[in-house]
Amino acid sequence: QGASIAAAVALPGAVAAQGRPVLKAGDQKGGLRALLEAAGGLEGLGYDIQWSEFPAAAPLAEALNAAAVDSGPIGDAPLIFALAAGTRVKAIGANRSDSYGTAVLVRPDSPLKTAADLKGKSIATNRGSIGHYVTLKAITSAGLKPDEVNIRFLAPADAKLALTQGSVDAWATWEPYTALAEVSRHARVLVSGRGLLPGLSYLAATDAAIAAKRPVLQDFLQRVVKAQLWSYRNVDAYSAALARIIGIPPEAAKLQFERRQQKWVAIDAQVIADQQGTADFYRQVGLIKQPLDVKGTFDTGFGVAG
């Protein structure tokens, strides 16, 4: 815990008592805080960071909607739900990665072999998560309809337990949970998101934070970009640090990190088109009721130069 990280709750407004700005940063397990701490990316801050960790993107999106956090990492699917709910939030940076680790998992001894075998089966995942997204893409790509499977909405810890105990047939999740399940041999990948998903995630921020703390957000995004570049130059060091910070075996940390191959990219026409495709898919399967134009969900004025 560096001295630059604000451990206490910030005073009302954007500025702490000592006159330094405060960034209320949401995060997920094994996310930006772990990356920045491992890379030394929190040194020399001109502002304090008040961290809040969430078990999944959906509660993080709710926190953004409530302005409980200023910014945080969120997947393409949860961003769609946030837009549909009227959340005043925008993506300020885009990240592309290999989607293998966003996957539908089954027990090692499961008789299920393909996505088509999920017909009539129960699948645990978070509502509105990328796990929910890969579930729907997997079953529709196999010719099934959403109502031909039983989706049970559970948080990751509960979903993992349900799969292990046999109360569900499958668990749709993401990294680092997928790598951890594989390394511990508690589950195997039935269907991966590779080839099904565009592999997009974002750093999102509230409209209010963008208006009031734009230089802080730009600096924070740039630190994240630089930390990620550092991580791929120092795979072993980062994997060891990630394992220590989030409490998972080093081999699981390294597995999920190496295969994700993440890269921050500019928010361009292709990113927006891919996000529009996700929104259109959700309309197609009935999860959102109205057509959505996603262009307004992006602020293209933030740079991501390495």
Place the predicted regions along the sequence by residue:
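Solvent-exposed, polar/charged alpha-helical surfaces in well-ordered, non-transmembrane soluble domains
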Residues: 34, 62, 66, 80, ...
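Secondary-structure end/capping motifs
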Residues: 212-289
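Conserved C-terminal helix/tail region of periplasmic/extracytoplasmic solute-binding proteins
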Residues: 283-306
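N-terminal export signals
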Residues: 1-17
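Short, glycine-/small- and polar/acidic-enriched structural segments
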Residues: 17-145, 150-153, 169-173, 188-190, ...
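Soluble non-cytosolic domains of exported or imported proteins
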Residues: 55-58, 73, 125, 129, ...
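Pocket-lining segment of extracytoplasmic ligand-binding domains
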Residues: 77, 151-152, 157-244
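Phosphate-coordinating loops and pocket residues in cytosolic domains that bind phosphorylated ligands
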Residues: 120, 183, 299
